């Protein structure tokens, strides 16, 4: 069983910022996340969406270039390249967070975490199970929208 002063369950913006701050305060810190660091917004929601919107904005600017006396003969959209760019943007930012974890000597444990006591988290990944003991635990798992009967999302 690994021992830490602080364990963070969840690698989104709440979790990774808390982990960095804990490490800055001198705490032996780990962060438990099943996926890439950064959370839903960075990896699958806000950031990739904004990258795709920027692609659309650039397309629209080129499409209207004639209004500025610029002639463009042919314009087309390469959808796979657009998706690749949005993934590349997200991956670059997530790797930046990984760098900050290493720089601050924070252990990133890949897997799902389950509280088994007030100081113990059992982690499970496709490769292994382990227990983490921590004096303090922060739950920063984010949220999902709740569906109500008759109002499914």
Question: What are the residue ranges of the model-derived segments?
Answer:
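N-terminal Rossmann-fold NAD(P) dinucleotide-binding loop
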Residues: 15
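Glycine-rich flavin
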Residues: 2-4, 20-27, 32-152
């Amino acid at each position: 069983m690994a021992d830490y002063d602080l364990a963070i369950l969840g690698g989104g913006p709440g979790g990774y910022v808390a982990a960095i701050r804990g490490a800055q305060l001198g705490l032996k810190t780990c962060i438990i996340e099943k996926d890439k660091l950064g959370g839903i917004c960075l990896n699958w929601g806000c950031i990739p969406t904004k990258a795709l919107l920027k692609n659309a904005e650039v397309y629209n600017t080129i499409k209207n270039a004639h209004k500025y006396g610029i002639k463009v003969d042919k314009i087309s959209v390469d959808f796979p390249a657009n998706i690749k760019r949005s993934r590349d943007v997200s991956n670059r930012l997530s790797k930046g967070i990984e760098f900050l974890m290493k720089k601050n000597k924070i252990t990133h444990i890949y897997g799902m975490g389950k509280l088994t006591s007030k100081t113990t988290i059992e982690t499970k990944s496709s490769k292994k199970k382990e227990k983490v003991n921590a004096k303090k635990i922060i739950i920063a798992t984010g949220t999902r929208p709740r569906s109500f009967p008759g109002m499914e999302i």
